[in-house]
Every structure is written in structure tokens, then in C-alpha cells.
Amino acid sequence: MTNICIIATIIIYLVAMLLVGFAYSKSNNDSTDFYLGGRKMGPLVTAMSAEASDMSSWLLMGMPGLAYLTGIASPGWTAIGLALGTWLNWLIVARRLRRYSANLEAITVPQFLSLRFHDQRNLLNALGAVIIIVFFVPYTASGFAACGKLFHSLFGVDYMAAMVVSACVIVGYTITGGFRAVTTTDLIQSIVMSLALVAVLVYGIGAAGGWDAVVANAQSLPGYLTMMASHNAAEGTATSYSLLDIVSTMAWGLGYFGMPHILLRFMAIEDEKKLVLSRRIASVWVIIAMTASIIIGMVGLGMTKAGALEYLSGSSSETVIVRIANLIAQHGILAAVLAGLILAGILAATMSTADSQMLAAASSVSQNILQEFGHMKLTERQSLFAARLTIICV
């Protein structure tokens, strides 16, 4: 009965994502609508879709798993770097990119670069598109694979079948609704991710014996609760965190300035003045979400200390939220539905990244390579058909 409730919750979630795509299927009249939502995105959707598409399942699996094993230093400095990178990206890049891309009527990042630097031969268009395709197609495929692995590990469902179903859902709402569907589903997925973090955190603290017990356990472990050292679980010792470690860990935040699927959100907002509000929303959510994720890792270890959760070594530490969700599901039907929502949050984290990267890769093929570099003359209807066909091929 528990598994049925969990699976039903996840199925309802997936169907809802498809319905969003169908709801926006009639709103795409040209390439600008399909790839940028007609530049009519509001500040909330812009902010939350950008951050949801950035975080991926790493927020709900990798980060709490790292905190569970090593303490707060490594995930903490990573979070600081990512928060700074997020804020600076919105502050420095967003307004200029929105203004210039609108003036140049550019709807993709490679096209913007080509027009901005007067590339008459469209070499920047082609090069940028190839780079996006080379790196985003495998990344998107890994997202589909992650969805398949999640269903297989939880319910014993055939891996290939689960992956194909997940891919069909993501491709389905992307191909029908385009950018509007992707950003709207990303907003919904960010909410589901947030609810998952809150639910796991509240239950976990109770199962660990309370917040004081969680902190006391963390304090008893060498290097666990300091930003200047990491905990070595195998040896039970602390390893100092050098300046080089700090800088290299924080450097993750530098990647934001070159992420096409995030930059497209800047180009799509309805008014550049609203980017200030978007920046505040995005920065606050990122800080809160990553802080909660790190604390969940610490709470998970507290649950292990209290005997509520087995010790998770190595890569199994990344399943700490999944294990907690399974414990929640044992407390009745409503609890099983909540557990399904938590697992849907992990699925949402993966889907929100995969759909955005798939759309960016598809736009690179149909818009930058075929039309700009290849000089194919297509009507708006033909261009939309090429865009949708490219998504299927990607």
C-alpha cells in the first residue's frame, strides 16, 4: 500500500507536468515565443526557473550526502561560492544581456554573441552552438538516466522503461509548450523541491531526538562543525581546510556566468527593471535551499546516531533524503503521499535541469546551425516544426 501511494503521487506529478505543456501549446506563434516565451516572463518565474534549472538533483542528493560524511566545511564553502556566483550573475550579466539581446533581437546565446561582435560569417553562432550541443546533450542524457535509476532503485522498475517514460514526459511538455512550459514547470518543481527539503528537515530533527541532539552529535565529531576543517569518518579525525581548498571549492560559482540555460532566463524577462526583484528572489531561495540541504546531511547523521537510520558510507550517503522519505512513508497513507512528494522533489530537481538544457541544445541546432550558419530560410511555422523536431532528435 505504501509503494502504491508513493507511485500514485509521482504519477500525478508527472501528469501535471504534461498538462502544463499542453496548456501552453497554443501560445507559441514564432521562434521567440518557443525559445524565450515572447520575452514576457514575470520576475518570480524568471528567478525560480533559473535556480531550479541550475540546482539539479545535486541539491537533494550530492550536497546533503557530502555534509553527512564530511561536515559543513566542504558543502558550506561550495554553497557560499554558488550563492555569490548567483548574485553576481544577476547583478552584472542579467540587465546588460536582457537589454542587448532585445535590441539585437537575439533569441539564443550564440546568436547574441554573433550579433554583438558583428560576426558576419556566423562562426560564433556555429561554434557556440557546437559547444552547447557537445556538453548539453550528454548532460541531458545523464538526467534521463538519473530518473531511470531513481525509479529502479526505489521500486524495482525496469531501468530502461523508467528512463524512457521520464524522457517522454520531459520531451512531451517541452515540445508542446516550449519555453513557457519549461519555466512554469521549473517554478512548480522549485516549490516541490522546497517542500521536500522542509518535510525531510522537520521529520529528521524529530527522529534524531531534537535539534540539541543533532548539534551535540555534530560537535562530538572532530572537524565536523567548523568551516576550517573537514571530518574524516574513516579515521575519526579532522583534516584542515587550506586556503587553496576554500578558493577551489568556492570557484564552483564562476560557472554561472557561462550557463546558457540560465542566461536565457535573463533574456526572457518582460522588463529589465524587474530583474532587481528576480535577483533578490533567486539569491534568497538559493541561500535557504542550500543551507537546508547541508543541515539535512547533519540531521541524517544525527538520525544514525539515534539508531533511526543505518550508517550511509560512500556514495550511499547521497540517498539520505530517499532513506528518510522511506521512513516517513511507514506512518500511514498521508505520510506515504508526503514521501511521494519528497521523491517527486528529487525527480523535479533532475527534470528542471534536463528540460532547460534540452531546450538550449535544440535551439542551438535549429536556430544557430540550420538557420543562421546554414542560411536555411524557414517560415515561422517551419521554424517551429524544426524546433520541435530538433528536441525529439536531441
What do the PLM-derived regions correspond to, one by one?
Residues 14-17, 53-54, 82-86, 129-133, ...:
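Residue-level recognition of pore/gate-forming positions within transmembrane alpha-helices
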Residues 1-61, 174-177, 190:
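Membrane-interface "cap" regions at the ends of multi-pass membrane proteins
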Residues 77-174, 251-255, 346-356:
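Helix-loop-helix module between adjacent transmembrane segments
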Residues 2-24, 67-107, 111, 193, ...:
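Extracellular loop-to-transmembrane helix junctions
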Residues 24-25, 33-38, 51, 65-69, ...:
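Helix-loop junctions at the membrane interface of multi-pass solute transporters
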Residues 1-2, 39-41, 45, 62-79, ...:
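Loop-to-helix junctions at membrane interfaces in multi-pass transport proteins
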Residues 116-126, 133, 363-394:
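Loop-to-transmembrane helix boundary motifs in multi-pass membrane proteins
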Residues 3, 7-11, 47-48, 76-80, ...:
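Hydrophobic alpha-helical transmembrane segments
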